[in-house]
């Protein structure tokens, strides 16, 4: 386990601070520093590479017994790039040449710079990565590489990019591979092109979906490929140290906007196939991210990593500042909870942004872990405690593996592409996923995220939730049908699979659910803001957009939960050896907004129906709208380790462990306070050890 901090974004902090800062970093319980190795700074003159400042920083780190993470910032390009590679500028969707400029938070270098589909630009970039690897791969205290920071490539492009000839050529090659040639594309798109060169990418939303969705998909794949190419350059030099990359958020939270496509920085699941690990940035206080959202955020990254390394690559160090505004306080206790939340999800490296307050541009006077917001002493004291505990209990934490889940939530990028093709925004789709995830986090029901192209291993799951999954293709429908036929449970919302990846609408009888005798009658206007579901109790749930009742079918429902004008609106159906829970509207989005506890009760009942029974249950206190007990667990060399996150220091929780997990009278040690807890009939009474949380280990 490594706990560190970002330090240097050239040329700041200035060299007069380095010696004392690195000593203070070590004294604060941190063991790693991250340095931004900027292409523009290192190669300010073509083919001359100056690493003098990095050499000195790395030497100071070694003297202070600090490991080093090197972040290759190749996306901040040299000022000479367009002079040495003429015509390398990106082109926007209107045909305009993109004028690069200094990035808002970086003092030297151009962004977005030249298009990396231009071979000459890529070779220049690859040379920088290669030179950096050759210089530092042999360091004894190198912890690893962050090969691509926040997966940035189009920042400050000021419009949709890139439509340069090189990228358009790559798009045509990609289409050729996707569809097996022009005939396959014409058949799928229902067009009559005479050559691939005539196929134009989608230009703007609210126009035909087909080419717009394909173009967005290509842009995602383009970023995936670029990450793989960066990684390959470094791996050719360094096969010892991990090569990771991180996004500004998990890929499922890139919803797009009017000047950027959703998931345009790559798909974490695809990135993890070639990298050694995946990370993301998180600024919880600045972004209003509470425990539930932070928990699902880290779970997204862990799920995508698929057993590879999980890094929290940028975590908020101090108070945020943008321009002449400051935002809230970063106090010690919540910051420590971010660390332990990451650990509970299996993160092995956590890096804070940053050590000192920034001094450049819009971020001036912000973000410093040791910054001058009045709270640095408490933050550093808390960090020292955590660093010491991680060192003392390294045998436990270094071998910790999170427990597995029996529930999966499906993330479908094609949903985002369709939504953006119409609305220039994939927010509906992201919120739907996060609504269901939040309901599970608040009940401490383990779950994972699934991605639409990674559904080959579903045997360990009992329940798969498909939030707003309006786009499904053959691969997904085949895997999901096999899952339910073999005994799994699917929870689906309205118009599941109503579109294919080409953006054509399917009639209800042609959709995924029709094979199980579940056929929607069509969209009906909302008459109320919610419906009552009748299970073993009546639950009023909020809904939105429309309702889609079902036609009568030979597959009669096992249970009818709700009706609309005499037609089934929500029900349980038998399907092979499994079952399908059909909901004829959208429930996750309004729950995320209104936090109706009845939705949580419904999800818990569906989980039980699917055969899911969490091995650890929170007996008390019951969650309120804003407060809840959050539990994560796993094992370290066979020993159970359980993390509890409390709403307050004065809270006491009763936690029940299943007999399969622990004997009914087992003893646990709370590692922060060294308190020994004896289970009574499998129930532990637990108080926070520190930071409104507890870490329990088998005694």
Spans of model-derived segments:
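The substrate-binding groove and active-site-proximal loops of carbohydrate-active enzymes
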Residues: 3-14, 36-52, 106-126, 160, ...
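A conserved amphipathic helix/loop scaffold
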Residues: 459, 467-699
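A short, well-structured beta->alpha microelement
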Residues: 438-457
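Hydrophobic targeting/anchoring helices
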Residues: 205, 244-435, 522-527, 534-543, ...
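Polysaccharide-binding and catalytic clefts of secreted carbohydrate-active enzymes
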Residues: 92-294
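Short, acidic/polar
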Residues: 12-27, 125-127, 131, 257-271, ...
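Aromatic-lined substrate-binding rim segments of carbohydrate-active enzymes
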Residues: 19-27, 31-100, 130-133, 229-237
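Short, well-ordered coil/turn segments that N-cap beta-strands
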Residues: 1-3, 29-31, 62-68, 138-143, ...
């Amino acid at each position: 386990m490594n706990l560190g901090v970002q330090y240097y974004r050239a040329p700041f902090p200035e060299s007069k601070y380095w010696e004392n800062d690195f000593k203070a970093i070590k004294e604060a319980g941190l063991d790693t520093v991250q340095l931004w190795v900027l292409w523009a700074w290192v190669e300010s003159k073509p083919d001359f590479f100056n690493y003098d400042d990095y050499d000195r920083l790395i030497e100071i780190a070694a003297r202070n017994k600090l490991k080093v993470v090197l972040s290759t910032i190749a996306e901040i390009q040299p000022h000479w790039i367009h002079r040495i590679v003429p015509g390398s500028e990106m082109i926007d969707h209107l045909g305009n040449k993109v004028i690069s400029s200094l990035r808002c938070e970086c003092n030297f270098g151009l962004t977005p710079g030249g298009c990396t589909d231009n071979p000459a630009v890529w070779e220049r970039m690859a040379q920088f990565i290669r030179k950096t690897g050759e210089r530092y791969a042999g360091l004894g205290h190198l912890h690893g590489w962050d090969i691509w920071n926040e997966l940035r490539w189009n920042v400050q492009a000021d419009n949709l990019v890139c439509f340069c000839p090189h990228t358009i050529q790559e798009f045509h090659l990609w289409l050729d591979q996707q569809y097996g040639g022009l005939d396959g594309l014409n058949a799928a798109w229902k067009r009559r092109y005479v050559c691939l060169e005539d196929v134009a990418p989608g230009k703007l939303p609210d126009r035909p979906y087909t080419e717009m969705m394909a173009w967005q998909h290509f842009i995602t794949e383009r970023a995936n490929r670029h990450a793989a190419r960066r990684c390959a350059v470094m791996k050719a030099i360094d096969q010892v140290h991990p090569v990771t990359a991180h996004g500004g958020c998990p890929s499922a939270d890139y919803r797009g906007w009017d000047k950027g496509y959703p998931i345009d920085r790559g798909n974490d699941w695809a990135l993890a196939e070639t990298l050694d690990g995946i990370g993301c940035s998180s600024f919880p206080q600045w972004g209003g991210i509470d425990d539930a959202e932070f928990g699902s955020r880290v779970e997204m990254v862990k799920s995508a990593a698929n057993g590879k390394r999980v890094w929290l690559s940028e975590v908020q160090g101090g108070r945020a500042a943008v321009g002449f505004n400051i935002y809230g306080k970063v106090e010690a206790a919540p910051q420590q909870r971010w660390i332990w939340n990451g650990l509970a999800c299996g993160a092995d490296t956590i890096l804070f942004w940053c050590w000192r307050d920034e001094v450049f541009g819009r971020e001036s006077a912000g973000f410093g872990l040791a910054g001058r917001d009045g709270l640095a002493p408490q933050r550093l004291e808390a960090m020292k405690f955590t660093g010491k505990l991680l060192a003392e209990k390294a045998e436990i934490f270094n071998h910790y593996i999170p427990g597995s889940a029996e529930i999966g939530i499906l993330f479908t990028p094609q949903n985002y592409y369709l939504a953006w093709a119409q609305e220039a925004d994939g927010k509906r789709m992201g919120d739907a996923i996060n609504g269901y995830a939040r309901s599970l986090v608040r009940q401490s029901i383990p779950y994972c995220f699934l991605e639409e192209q990674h559904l080959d291993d579903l045997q360990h799951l009992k329940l798969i939730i498909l939030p707003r999954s309006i786009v499904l293709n053959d691969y997904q429908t085949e895997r999901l049908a096999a899952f339910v036929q073999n005994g799994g449970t699917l929870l689906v919302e309205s118009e599941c699979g109503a579109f294919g990846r080409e953006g054509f609408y399917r009639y209800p009888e042609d959709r995924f659910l029709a094979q199980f005798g579940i056929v929607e009658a069509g969209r009906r206007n909302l008459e109320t803001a919610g419906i009552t579901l009748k299970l073993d109790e009546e639950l009023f749930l909020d809904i939105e957009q429309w309702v889609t009742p079902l036609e009568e079918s030979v597959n009669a429902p096992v249970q009818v939960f709700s009706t609309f004008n005499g037609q089934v609106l929500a029900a349980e159906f038998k399907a092979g050896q499994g079952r399908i829970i059909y909901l004829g509207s959208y429930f996750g989005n309004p729950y995320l907004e209104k936090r109706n506890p009845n939705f949580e009760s419904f999800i818990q009942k569906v989980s039980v129906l699917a055969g899911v029974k969490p091995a650890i249950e929170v007996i008390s206190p019951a969650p309120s709208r804003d407060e809840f007990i959050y539990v994560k667990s796993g094992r370290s060399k066979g020993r159970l380790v359980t993390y509890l996150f409390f709403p307050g220091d004065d809270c006491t929780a009763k936690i029940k462990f299943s007999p399969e997990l622990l004997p009914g009278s087992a003893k646990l040690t709370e590692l922060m306070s060294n308190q020994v807890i004896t289970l009574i009939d499998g129930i532990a009474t637990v108080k926070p050890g520190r930071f409104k949380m507890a870490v329990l280990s088998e005694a």
